[in-house]
């Protein structure tokens, strides 16, 4: 099997896709930080067939070490795939910068509409969704620390120019304004732009940043998890992670959501603030219905959207690129 070098620092990545490759019997080396010794271990000693980078990979490291990594990878003819996990909002500022810096052989993107942008650059490109890792995203006993009616895990926007703004106003605003038992984790909520967004979030609802390792506990402890979406044509990682955990997901009915999941079977969708209030009231009172949908959602992502399946897609893509 192919040997996989996975270059990522954040647990939100290292606890995901690498497990999928392991389940396909691919040896995996996780490279979290760059130094001369770590590059030697990852490239010269491990001798990978495929290197995967992603996200804002160019920002954490010095140019010297990045060039050393790509030079060594090229020397041993390692196939380099960049996974564009910040598309489409940050394609120019993030993905294109990473491509310029790391010079990958091919690109996979979470946004189907961005595929042709990479092909126009002369790079083989395909779509690859996020997924779930059943070894991490799974049922576990509730934790009283996270016992809330409604929770939201996700960062507040910087400029709120994407569909994420609409998601917040449909899902979060009506519940905050009515004083529901809500907890919000993530960056920048303490600098929330009240004037732009049209409502104020009480400070007791804002809980700060949450280690990724804690997220599954939250999903298993809260009764309803709000799932913001950033774009009509892509799905956030938390969509799959919440469902994989067995949590009940309330999101918005974007094209991508309704393409993969059935409303009130795998998750629930609110099209307006009024929908959100009605659905939250209903599902807080109807525990059995809420739990049945959560079980269905977990079953669906375990069947079709695990990182084992995503790893298989990457291997198939790499084989296709090699043949062409």
Task: Identify the role of each PLM range.
Residues 1-46, 55-68, 106-240, 248-258, ...:
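Nucleotide-sugar donor-binding catalytic core of glycosyltransferases
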Residues 45-46, 102, 305:
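Active-site charged/polar residues at nucleotide-handling catalytic sites that mediate phosphoryl
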Residues 73-86, 106:
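Active-site proximal beta-strand in glycosyltransferases
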Residues 91-105:
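Membrane-proximal helix-turn-helix segments that form the acceptor-binding/catalytic region
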Residues 267-273, 282-287:
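Conserved acidic donor-binding segment of nucleotide-sugar-dependent glycosyltransferases
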Residues 276:
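Catalytic phosphate/metal-binding cores of nucleic-acid and nucleotide-processing enzymes, i.e., regions
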Residues 289-303, 313:
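A short, well-ordered alpha-helix in the C-terminal region of glycosyltransferases
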Residues 307-324:
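C-terminal alpha-helical cap of glycosyltransferases
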């Amino acid at each position: 099997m192919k040997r996989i070098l996975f270059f990522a620092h954040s647990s939100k990545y290292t606890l995901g896709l690498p497990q999928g490759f392991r389940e396909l019997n691919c040896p995996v080396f996780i490279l979290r930080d760059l130094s001369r010794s770590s590059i030697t271990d990852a490239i010269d000693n491990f001798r990978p067939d495929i290197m995967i980078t992603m996200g804002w990979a160019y920002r954490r490291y010095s140019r010297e070490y990045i060039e050393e990594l790509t030079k060594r990878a090229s020397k041993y003819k390692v196939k380099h795939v960049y996974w564009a996990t910040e598309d489409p909002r940050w394609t120019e500022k993030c993905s294109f910068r990473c491509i310029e810096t790391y010079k990958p052989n091919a690109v996979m993107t979470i946004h189907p509409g961005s595929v042709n942008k990479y092909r126009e650059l002369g790079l083989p490109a395909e779509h690859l969704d996020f997924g779930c890792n059943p070894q991490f995203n799974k049922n576990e006993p509730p934790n009283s620390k996270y016992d809330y009616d409604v929770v939201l895990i996700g960062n507040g926007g910087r400029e709120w120019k994407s569909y994420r703004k609409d998601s917040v106003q449909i899902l979060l605003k009506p519940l905050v304004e009515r004083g529901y038992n809500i907890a919000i984790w993530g960056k920048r909520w303490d600098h929330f732009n009240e004037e732009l967004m049209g409502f104020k979030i009480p400070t007791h609802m804002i809980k700060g940043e949450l280690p990724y390792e804690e997220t599954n506990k939250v999903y298993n402890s809260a009764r309803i998890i709000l799932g913001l979406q950033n774009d009509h044509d892509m799905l956030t990682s938390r969509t799959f992670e919440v469902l994989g955990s067995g949590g009940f997901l309330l999101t918005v009915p974007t094209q991508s959501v309704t393409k993969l999941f059935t409303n009130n079977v795998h998750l629930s969708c609110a099209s307006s603030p009024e929908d959100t209030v009605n659905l939250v009231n209903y599902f807080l009172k109807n525990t059995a219905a809420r739990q049945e949908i959560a079980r269905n959602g977990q079953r669906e992502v375990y069947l079709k959207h695990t990182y084992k399946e995503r790893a298989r897609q990457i291997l198939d893509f790499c084989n296709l690129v090699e043949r062409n």
